[in-house]
Amino acid sequence: MSGAFDSSSLEPLRAKLVGHPVFHSVTTLPRLRVFMEHHVYPVWDFMSLLKSLQQTFAPHGSPWLPDGDGDIRRFVNEIVTEEESDQALPGGEAEYISHFDMYRQSMSEIGADLGGINDFINCVAADGLARGLARREVPEVARRFMRSTFNVIESGKPHHIAAAFALGREDIVPGMFK
């Protein structure tokens, strides 16, 4: 059995996601606001998936111990650096900004409500993920999506986490927003 994965079996699912009607229904500013108020949660949980990969393949802590494959560590850390501290847009207050914060800035610029996501983040920070997910302000579809993501993370299976990240996010997301 080869270690290579043939992703062609995922093409029908990829086409279904990329062609989802929601992407063709965002035709007005009010619809864009609603979309972003829901989509911001997967933007956040993407970072949790990525940080789980980092903890697995590029663990941090003190004392530091040499472990794992340097090429994989470098690859994961480069993605984390890009996602957590990308070059900010000109004219902003900061020179570097996370993609999540950039998304929230974009939401603010179009008048989308940031209350739900900000309350969610504050609740997760203070009371944990389970309490955050239980908040009634979290859209049900976002809650189900995040639960699915965290089930993968909590499985502790690096190959599942990497597959969710690579095939379920990095490979598919660009096509959704063309």
Label every model-predicted segment.
Residues 74, 78-178:
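Active-site-proximal alpha-helical scaffolds that flank and shape metal-associated catalytic sites
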